[in-house]
Amino acid sequence: PRLARHLAPADALALDAVPVGRAGRQLVVATCRPDRAGRIHAALDLPQGQEALITVAPRAQITATQIALYGERLARLAEGQAPQRHSCRGWRPARASGAFGLLATLSALVALLVPATLVAAVFGLALIVFLGNTALKAAAYATTLRADRRRVPATGTDPPDPGQNGPVFSILVPLYREPEIATTLLDRLARLDYPRERLEVLLVVEQDDTVTRAVLATAKLPGWVRVITVPQGHPRTKPRALNFALGFARGEIIGIYDAEDRPEPDQLSRVARRFAAAGSETACLQGRLDYYNARHNLLSRLFAIEYAIWFRVLLPGVQRMGLAVPLGGTTLFLRRAALEAVGGWDAHNVTEDAELGLRLARNGYRTEVIATTTFEEANAAVLPWIRQRARWQKGYLMTWAVAMRSPCALWRDLGPGRFVAMQAQILFAVLGFLLAPLLWSLAVKPFGVAHPLDAVVGPLGYGVLATLFVASVCLSIAIALRATRAPHLRGLRPVIPLSELYFLLATLSAWRAAAEMLLRPFWWAKTRHGAFGGTVAATAGPADVTDPTPSRPLPSGARRRRWRGAP
């Protein structure tokens, strides 16, 4: 602590310097950038008459010493880095439980007094959510179809490969209890075809994760890879670790990968070219995600189809419509200046990616979906799948609840159209699964079984509902067929009709997410990697199969349009 007072943490990180001791009356300061000696001297807070002695040390040693000296203070900053009005750290489960209890009591009272009214209201809400989700899906699909038909193959639209003049990338890879996959990860990242002097990879590990730290300690790390050890604290989440590591990154572009990821080798070059061509308002590029173990079992096949639908059809459509883009947790690349301007990640949100995408949109930034793919490991067992999906859905609910604390501000930031669309994108995405059993109950009507809705819905009404449900299923199948055009995905098409059954699991996870909102709002359900093929060779699998879709970044239909009617 006595050494730390001579150099502020922010200055130490910015200057790649750290006080390490004393030599007589001189303060010894180590740095890996001796060219910054003058700036280091200027930043030091020394008593009158005391001097500093600058010494040179490797960057990895500088980083480790900075963490030892400033780590606890930086960790506390990481926990509260996001602006209070955008953060869920003020979420009070007891207050939410009280509101839920009051709602349940009122519902029970209505059920006793006017049961038909309650039935009509609940089923009406379920139908509104269903129609909202279907409309958003249809609009995104139609937008993607129109754009694909107009698309011209890439012929040098973006600048040439930046080579040695490209931006410096800092790739953050959070690891927690990943001893089996850590060495495989290094092999996969080594395939990235980008100048090493303009690339650094920060492996972010928790202080108490002794197993992963031991594996990394024995690994032979290249000079462009560093280990960042995050001090213990609360909450123990991925966004907290990312906030902590951000201060140690030196790149102007911040990229995020997960432990099991295998990005395409030219991914960073594509991202660099697109950032060079896009304006400064384009703050984020989101890559596509796919699975290298899609054929592990039926669940992994259906999961791969869902990912193809999301990243190859719906998300590009959402982007072209000018709506807020809920980011994926990996293969996203951010301009550092924009990331810092919006306050980094919310350390308490367990779906930090979607929340950050919304916050970028609220601050006037754009996100583009870029046609480059990272292959990762599909969760191929039912219970782990439900745990993972519940975490995502809990984060969506939390993101919506925080944003709607001030609906007028959200309306002002997004505009009317994007405000309405956000309700479907975030709230309806979870509410649809919570209420789905109500709509499933209508399946008994073709068999002449009585239903509580019979009092308010006649035969014609049931016919209209049946038509809507069949049309929705047909739309989903059409989107899935479109999403699986790539050669390595076509083999998944025979199981597309089973997707409706697959989403039954999402209803189970949605109810678990709702319960966790009240009981364990900040708990991070860890996804285990390596159990379903995550440790296969770096070059194996479908990543080497040519994808027929052009590598050109997807154009945006937004172009700074704000939906005060249409974004």
Go through each PLM region and give its residues.
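Cytosolic-side membrane-insertion boundary helix
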Residues: 65-103
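Polyanionic, low-complexity intrinsically disordered segments
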Residues: 1-47, 59
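Membrane-embedded multi-pass helical conduit in multi-pass membrane proteins
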Residues: 110-161, 424-519
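Long helical/loop segments within the catalytic core of UDP-sugar-dependent glycosyltransferases
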Residues: 217-252, 265-350, 390-401, 502
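Acidic donor-binding segment of Leloir-type glycosyltransferases
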Residues: 190-233
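Cell-envelope/extracellular polymer assembly enzymes that use nucleotide-activated donors
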Residues: 167-170, 200, 340, 355
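N-terminal signal-anchor transmembrane helix
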Residues: 135-197
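Catalytic donor-sugar/metal-binding loop of nucleotide-sugar-dependent glycosyltransferases
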Residues: 357-375
